[in-house]
């Protein structure tokens, strides 16, 4: 049974992708992370030794801290945050518990490098249609809640990507775009391992509206 400062895997999974999803912080040590370099959707990785430095950014938000098994690292980190005025819980069973429940996990290698502010930066064509609206929604809800999106003239997408260290998407000739009959939203689902009944249904709607 979860303690008053724990949240179960099932409870957290129901919040993922919703406006009520807490900020999720992964504090696994390097060996545990290297053994499974994937994150719970929307999670960000930080060292337990630096947890207090996150306080200002986390004030007023609900936080869930996860380590390998939900023991010393997450419980100690969450306790520090609570002492500093942050509403913080730990994930019961930690990363291992999430994996055992066979829930989606995002491969870190697929996430673009973050800027100095800790945000991924993406760029695409201005005047977005459904695919270029759905993709930012997906990224902010399931990959990087603080992601930055730049909408520029079509002819300047790749130039902006180069000069602003942004990742281009939904244009011809780039990785994060249409693949055969699939739209860009499908590519994000595939690469980030985010398939679920709900997101697959949404992908069908996006694909139908985008390719007709």
Predicted stretch roles:
Residues 1-23, 27-64, 69-130, 135-136, ...:
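Rhodanese-like catalytic fold shared by cysteine-dependent sulfurtransferases
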Residues 27, 148-158:
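A short beta-strand-loop structural module common to alpha/beta enzyme folds
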Residues 201-212:
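An accessory alpha-helical subdomain
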């Amino acid at each position: 049974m979860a303690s008053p400062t724990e949240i179960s895997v099932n409870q957290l999974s129901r919040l993922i992708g919703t406006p009520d999803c807490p900020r999720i912080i992964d504090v696994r040590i390097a060996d545990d992370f290297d053994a499974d370099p994937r994150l719970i959707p929307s999670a960000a990785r930080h060292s337990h030794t630096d947890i207090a430095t996150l306080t200002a950014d986390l004030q007023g938000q609900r936080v869930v801290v996860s380590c390998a098994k939900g023991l010393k690292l997450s419980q100690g980190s969450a306790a520090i945050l609570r002492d500093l005025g942050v509403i913080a819980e730990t994930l019961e069973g930690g990363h291992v518990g999430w994996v055992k429940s066979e829930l989606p996990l995002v491969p870190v290698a697929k996430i673009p490098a973050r800027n100095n502010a800790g945000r991924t930066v993406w760029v695409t064509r201005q005047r977005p249609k459904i695919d270029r609206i759905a993709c930012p929604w997906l990224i902010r809800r399931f990959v990087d809640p603080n992601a930055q999106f730049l909408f520029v003239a079509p002819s300047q997408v790749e130039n902006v990507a180069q000069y602003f260290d942004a990742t281009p998407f939904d244009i011809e000739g780039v990785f994060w775009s249409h693949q055969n009959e699939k739209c860009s939203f499908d590519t994000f689902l595939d690469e980030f391992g985010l398939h679920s009944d709900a997101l697959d249904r949404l992908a069908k709607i996006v694909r139908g509206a985008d390719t007709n």
